[in-house]
């Protein structure tokens, strides 16, 4: 394990990045067990209309989440997914997405660019969903349909390193549930993927421990690199 004890003598920081890494498997496991309730609303929204594509609008860590989940969503749902930076969407790209479900993503719910994108999507008459990690965040005041990833917990994930893998999991679970209900993804493949996801979550602590061991065995060489 990384040596954090000395760093934690600085009392200004309640939680370190590695603490959030340690919390990720338990958060992912809880989300997986609660997947029906967690992604159910987004599944219902998507299935309510014959959307031709999904537009994921995001920046920062949310953009990474969208990148991680884009191709899984396309594969499981059988619809095109566009990934657009929040500023680009709000300033230039908001006009070109007919028959699309626009998902505006902000981990904190405070991104002013993503909030502006929500406003633009509504002005264009698009169906828009805002999703964040934090309940009652500022973005909730600008969108009628607001969802939560289900990964928020006491102490918050100030580094968003817990949020990236768990929020990616949220979208993969959404796509699988919606895909099988839509008939776009076979039931036997759905069951196989769910078992794989459960196995991956279970193995996350072991993988992290193996990475710790590798790092400690090679850190001198890594530190010497220029």
Predicted regions and their residues:
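N-terminal amphipathic/basic leader segments beginning at the initiator methionine
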Residues: 2-30
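Short coil-to-helix leader/linker segments, especially the first N-terminal amphipathic alpha-helix
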Residues: 26-33, 78-82
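Short amphipathic alpha-helical interaction patches enriched in hydrophobic/aromatic residues
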Residues: 25-28, 178, 182, 226
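Cofactor-pocket helix-loop regions in the catalytic cores of large enzyme subunits
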Residues: 29-34, 38-47, 195-226
């Amino acid at each position: 394990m990384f040596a954090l004890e000395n760093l934690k003598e600085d009392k200004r920081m309640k939680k370190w990045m590695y603490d959030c890494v340690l919390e990720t498997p338990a958060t992912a496991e809880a989300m997986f067990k609660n997947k029906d309730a967690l992604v159910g609303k987004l599944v219902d929204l998507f299935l309510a209309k014959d959307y031709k594509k999904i537009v994921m609008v995001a920046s920062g860590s949310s953009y990474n989440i969208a990148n991680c989940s884009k191709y899984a969503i396309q594969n499981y749902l059988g619809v095109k997914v566009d990934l657009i930076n929040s500023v680009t969407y709000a300033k230039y790209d908001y006009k070109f997405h007919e028959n699309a479900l626009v998902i505006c993503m902000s981990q904190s719910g405070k991104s002013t660019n993503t909030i502006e994108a929500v406003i633009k999507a509504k002005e264009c008459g698009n169906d828009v969903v805002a999703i964040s990690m934090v309940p009652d965040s500022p973005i909730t005041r600008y969108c009628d349909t607001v969802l939560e990833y289900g990964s928020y917990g006491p102490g918050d994930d100030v580094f968003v390193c817990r949020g990236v893998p768990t929020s990616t999991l949220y979208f993969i679970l959404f796509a699988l549930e919606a895909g099988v209900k839509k008939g776009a993804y076979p039931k036997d493949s759905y069951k196989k993927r769910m078992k794989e996801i459960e196995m991956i979550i279970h193995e996350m602590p072991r993988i992290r421990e193996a990475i710790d061991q590798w790092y400690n065995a090679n850190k001198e060489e890594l530190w010497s690199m220029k």
